[in-house]
Amino acid sequence: MSTNFAATTFTDPSKIRNFCIIAHIDHGKSTLADRILQLSQVVEERDMRDQYLDNMDIERERGITIKAQNVRLPWIPRSGEFEGQEIVMQMIDTPGHVDFTYEVSRALEACEGAILLVDAAQGIEAQTLANLYLAMENDLEIIPVLNKIDLPAADPEKYALEIAHIIGCEPEEVLRVSGKTGEGVPELLDKVAELIPAPTSEFGEDAPARAMVFDSVYDTYRGVVTYIRMMDGKLTPRQKVTMMATGTNHELLEVGIVSPTMQKCKGLGPGEVGYLITGVKNVRETKVGDTITWASNGASEPLKGYADPNPMVYSGLFPISQADFPDLRDALEKLQLNDASLTFEPETSVALGFGFRCGFLGLLHMEITRDRLEREFGLDLISTAPSVTYRVVAEDGEESMVHNPSDWPGGKLREVYEPIVKMTIIVPEEFVGSTMELCQSKRGQMGGMDYLSEDRVELRYTMPLGEIIFDFFDMLKSRTKGYASLNYEEAGEQLADLVKVDILLNGDPVDAFSAIVHRDSAQWYGNKMTKKLKELIPRQQFEVPVQAAIGSKIIARENIRAMRKDVLAKCYGGDISRKRKLLEKQKAGKKRMKSIGSVSVPQEAFVAALSTDAE
C-alpha cells in the first residue's frame, strides 16, 4: 500500500480540495465513492466492500445515505495543471433525500465545490435539482458528471444536453464516468483538482480558531464524535474550546481525520476537515451547524448559516408493551445524539398508554427513525397517523399551535391556518394528466409547468403539507409507474376550513384515531375509519356502535353486532310467550351490559387501523 501523505495534517490550504457529491437516490453516488477510495488506495483491496461509507445497515438496505460521511484522500493528478503534485482531497458524502435538506446544506457549507452526479439512463431528478440550486446559492463550483455510462440503456448525449441546459455549460463539458467499472474516474479526480478552488481562510491560520460542525455521531465508548470543517486558525488536542450556539466549554481529548477510518493527528489547520472528541455524553451540546472556537481569546463572530431545523411532521410513538417505555426514552435520546433534527416530548393516550410525540423533518425521516428504533434497539412500536402543525385562532382571539389532534381546542374557532409547501414534480410527459388530477384532488394549486426536454415535464404546485404526508408519494408513484420524482420546500401557511374528526366506540372518543382533516374530506375519512374498525374489532357481548363525529354531529356510523347465546336451546316446543320471556330477559341483560361494559380493542386493531392503505 502506498504511503498516505494525506494522513499528515496542517496541509497548505492551496493543496486542499473540499468537495461533495450531489446525486439522487440510486444514481450511483456510493459506488462512485467506492471507486474513488480504491483509486486513492486508502482502503486495502481486502477491506473493500460495497457502499463502504454507508455504515448503518438501514443505509445499505435501502440504498440511501442518511448521515453525511467524510473521507480524506491523497491524490496525485495524472493530467491538468497540477500534474504530479500531491493534492489532499476531502470528500463529504451527502444524503440525497428531500427530508435531509438541512444535512445537505451543512455539508455544502463545508465544501468549495460539488460533483453533480446524474444517472445516464434516467436524467436529473427533482431532489437533485433542489440540492443543485442549494449548491449554486452557496457559490460552489459545479462539476457535472454522467454516471453509469456502461449501462446498455444509457443515453449520455440526451442527458448531457439536459444538464447543460440547467447549469448553463456546454454539453461537451459534462464528464462521463462509470462508478461500476471505474472508467473516467481518474479524469474526474484530476478535474476536481483543477476546477474546484482551494479553501480560503477569512482571517488566516494565526487567527482565533473557527470550525463549523457539520455532523455529530454518538460513540458508546468515547461519547460524541463531532465532525468539523476548519475555517480559520488551528485546533490541537488538550485545548479548551467553546461551542458558540450553546455556550458550553469542553476540552479536546482527541483531534483526528477520517481516512477512511478514524486516525488521531496533531491538530487541524484552516480548510481541513476532521473530527473532535471532547468526552461529552450529551449531544444536545454539540449542535450541527454550530461554530467551535477557543475558550480563551476565541473568535467573536460565529460562522453564519446556523439554523435549528424545524420539524414538519409529527407522529406519536407508543411501545406495544408499556414496560418498554423507559427503553423507548433511552433509544430516542440516543438517536437524538445522531440526529439533531429529531424532537420528542412525552405524551399519554387513553388507548395506547404512555409514549412520545415526535417531530420529524418529513415522511422518510419518520419511517427511518421508526425502523432504527425497532432494529437497533429491538422495540415494538405503534405510530399514530402523522400530522402537521396548525395555527388555530379561537373565537376570543387566542392563538395556539396544535400538532396533536387531541390538543385541538373545542368550541368555535375563528380561523385555522395550515402549513403549505411548494412542490416540484418531474414526470414523463405521458403521465402529466394523471399527476395533475392527483394534485388537484389533494387541494393543490398549479404554479406552472416547464418542459425540461421533449419528454420530461416539470410541474410546480402549492399544496397543503397535511395532504401530502399521508400517502401522496405512494399514489404519485403508482400513477406514474414509478417514474415521477418530487421535491418540496416550506412556503408559509394559508387559511383553511379544517375540522377535527373523532372516532367514537360505544359513545366514547378514542384519541388515537382522531384526525384533523379538511371539511370536504371529513365524510370520506369518517366512512373509511368506521368501516375499517368494524372489520378489525372483534364482536363483543353487546352491540357496539362505531361512529365518526365532528364536535357533537355524527357523520358516519357502523355497528359491530353482538355475540348471542342461543337462550331458546333448552326450551323444547314450548309456548311463544315462554320463548319471548327468555329473549326479553337476554335483551335486558345486554342492555345493562352495554351501559356498564367497556369495549376491548386488541392491539392489532390499532396497528392495522393506523397503518396507511393503498386507497
Swiss-Prot record:
This is Elongation factor 4. It is found in: Cell membrane. One of its GO terms (cellular component) is plasma membrane. Residues 14-200 form the tr-type G domain. It comes from Corynebacterium aurimucosum (strain ATCC 700975 / DSM 44827 / CIP 107346 / CN-1). Its EC number is 3.6.5.n1. It is an enzyme of class 3 (hydrolase). It catalyses: GTP + H2O = GDP + phosphate + H(+). Keywords: Cell membrane, GTP-binding, Hydrolase, Membrane, Nucleotide-binding, Protein biosynthesis. The lineage of its organism: Bacteria, Bacillati, Actinomycetota, Actinomycetes, Mycobacteriales. PANTHER family: TRANSLATION FACTOR GUF1 HOMOLOG, CHLOROPLASTIC (PTHR43512:SF4), TRANSLATION FACTOR GUF1-RELATED (PTHR43512). GTP binds at residues 26-31, 147-150. It is a peripheral membrane protein. The keyword Cell membrane applies. HAMAP family: LepA (MF_00071). The keyword Zinc-finger does not apply.
